Amino acid sequence: MKASSVLLGLAPLAALAAPTPEAELSARQAQQSIDALMKAKGKLYFGTATDQGLLNTGKNSAIIKADFGQVTPENSMKCQSLENTRGQYNWAPADALVNFAVSNNKSIRGHTLIWHSQLPGWVNNINDRNQLTTVIQNHVATVMGRWKGKIRAWDVVNEIFNEDGTMRQSVFSRVLGEDFVRIAFEAARKADPNAKLYINDYNLDRPNAGKLTKGMVGHVKKWVGAGVPIDGIGRQGHLQSGQGNGLGQGIKGLGDSGVKEVGGNELDIQGNNGNEFGGGNKACLPVPACVGIPAWGVRDNDSWRPQGNPLLFDSNYNPKPAYNSVVQALK
């Protein structure tokens, strides 16, 4: 048999053995998985935000499997997405994310139960204290109950402070005052006693800012002291270039509030030079309460604010200098 015939005979076998692009991507990224590096430093995860549509797009799911140990639903668990009509739930998109995470051994952060934005009109129109209390309790119990035991942590209340540390005006604060925080957290603890319960907000990166000191830290200390079951504070990080340098002080300030956990949530940095992403993750390492950092997405053009290339991967799913800076910061 001629050599050419042998080669031709082997060609189909070689084609069958050739790895798929997704397999090649997984193998390449897993060699320096940022989630594995974060866990090697004693933390719980390096995470990202995604949803059903993104998981079915391009190489998103392959990168998440290889590089990220935690997922947060970007929109599918918000009230308007889940219960736009009272008592009628749209579970499919969030179920898809939970099923993906469970089947791939990823931790899940539920986001978010009580938020003034992306809120159905029927909730905003409530004026009766007892009615709103019941709505909060039922929504929390129903949503958390569906995935009880599958979701590690929940953002129970989200973005409730103004920049000066006062409470934001919303239907919740208007009708219930700040007592809606207690109502929501007590309902959450009852719904899933083993889940970690978080309060989440942005602009908590400046150590002397009113939102951090008077708002988040001051209120959380008071609420925890009164028995409100708050386990952790989520610090969003939707930043501009140059703002990443304050992450360390902000994380430490939150850790001083007395909560058990601090999660650096929703990190993206517009116009970053690469080094700031690494610095933001390194800032978590010396703070015992800091359990991990989630980026807010995988690649730039899928970001909620794609201008300024704020994420770790470019539009072709190639790791950027920001990705490499995280790897170096965690080694």
From Swiss-Prot:
The active site is at E159 (proton donor), E266 (nucleophile). SUPFAM superfamilies: (Trans)glycosidases. It holds the Pfam family Glyco_hydro_10. GO terms for biological process: xylan catabolic process. Induction: Expressed in presence of rice cell walls or on oat spelt xylan, but not when grown on sucrose. One of its GO terms (molecular function) is endo-1,4-beta-xylanase activity. InterPro entries: GH10 (IPR044846), GH10_dom (IPR001000), Glycoside_hydrolase_SF (IPR017853). Glycans are attached at N105, N301. Disulfide bonds join C284-C290. Gene3D superfamilies: Glycosidases (3.20.20.80). Residues 31-329 form the GH10 domain. Its EC number is 3.2.1.8. It comes from the Eukaryota. Its main location: secreted. GO terms for cellular component: extracellular region. It is found in: Secreted. Residues 1-17 form the signal peptide. Keywords: Carbohydrate metabolism, Disulfide bond, Glycoprotein, Glycosidase, Hydrolase, Polysaccharide degradation, Secreted, Signal, Xylan degradation. Pathway: Glycan degradation; xylan degradation. It catalyses: Endohydrolysis of (1->4)-beta-D-xylosidic linkages in xylans. Disruption phenotype: Retains 39 percent of the catalytic activity. Double xyl1/xyl2 deletion mutant retains 19 percent of the activity and exhibits a 50 percent reduction in accumulation of total mycelial mass. Endo-1,4-beta-xylanase involved in the hydrolysis of xylan, a major structural heterogeneous polysaccharide found in plant biomass representing the second most abundant polysaccharide in the biosphere, after cellulose. Accounts for approximately 70 percent of the endoxylanase activity in the culture filtrate. Belongs to the glycosyl hydrolase 10 (cellulase F) family. This is Endo-1,4-beta-xylanase 2. It comes from Pyricularia grisea (Crabgrass-specific blast fungus).
